[in-house]
Amino acid sequence: MLESSNIAVPLRWRPMQPADVDQCVDIVAAHPVIGPRYGADIENLGRAWRHLLGSAAVNNAVFERPDRKHATIVGIGFAVFVRDKFIHEIKTPPLPWVGPELARRVVGGDSPVLTDDEVRDANSGAGLSEIVWAGTGVPEFEQTRDFYHLMVSSYVEAHRGFLLNELISAQAESVEQLLGGVEAGGLYWNPTHQDYEKAPPEPAGVFVARPHLVGITRKLALTRRGSWVSTLFDYRPPRFGFTRGEQQLLQTALTSFQGTDQELAGALHLSVPTVKKMWGSIYRRVADCDPELVPDSTLAESGTRERGREKRRSLLAYIREHPEELRLHSRKLLRQNLRQMTGE
């Protein structure tokens, strides 16, 4: 058994793959608090997650401890962008256990999870509302400092650059976890008052034992600037308007950073000439908006290797600091909303 704070535990995270789902469901099912909340609905969880993998509305992670021969999954994070109607429903008494409710609805064909088009439109206008479906680990790891820090850093990385309207955390499994969520910036949902509040509407032990919500809205985040959660609501609109295919190329290049066109083509199941054409389109979009970021972009297309590599490194460094460029969005809707905000 690992002690919580003083042992450095080598951990890493990556996106969940279909082959991971059964192990992740087993972690939830075996959890002494979360598992019983699901009851028979644990049978729906794997089917629901498999159905949603690859959706633009899903942000997920598996946390691994790397060993010499293989890596062991020790925790999971799974969050979804949902429709505002569902947010209203789960805030209305009687409150449900959200994880089982989501599993039932997704498997039953009544999914509240946004489609890719709905993610694009909400991220270009009213903003996105998200629920953390699951965020837990095996008992010997979930209380360690390293596990907590990795969960936070992966969550921040996955959510920077989105236009967020409301975030609701996973329903706490203990008073300690509940208080940790509030210290991070969350507020208690009072179903009677239909509002977020700084103090729980009942003793913390009672609050966490029943279905409950802790979350924060964009408006309320302005009052909690000292928390890391509030930083997720900092938003800048994208400048370049990359297509979805260009975003996927850039995201893949960021992951490998030094990936060649041949490697990128293999990862994306594209031909090398197609990848080269996409880079040319990307450079032209950037040059039209910010010529100094990729000067002499024609050189990159004409085969000047060293200049092309430097240009790519410069662009990827910018994209790494501006993840909004990789999020689904509609340039048309963004322009319309900007005109409305400025009164033009």
Label for each model-derived stretch:
Residues 92-185:
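Acyl-donor binding region in acyl/amide transferases
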Residues 259-307:
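Recognition helix of helix-turn-helix DNA-binding domains
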Residues 2-44:
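Short amphipathic alpha-helix that is part of the acyltransferase structural core
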Residues 252-258, 319:
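Short helix-to-turn junction characteristic of helix-turn-helix DNA-binding domains
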Residues 111, 148-245, 273, 293-294, ...:
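Linker/hinge segments immediately adjacent to helix-turn-helix/homeobox DNA-binding domains
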Residues 47-75, 82-89:
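A short helix-loop-beta-strand connector motif used in the catalytic cores of GNAT acetyltransferases and
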Residues 83-100, 253:
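A short, polar/charged loop-to-alpha-helix boundary motif
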Residues 246-252, 264:
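Short alpha-helical "packing" element that flanks the helix-turn-helix/winged-helix DNA-binding module
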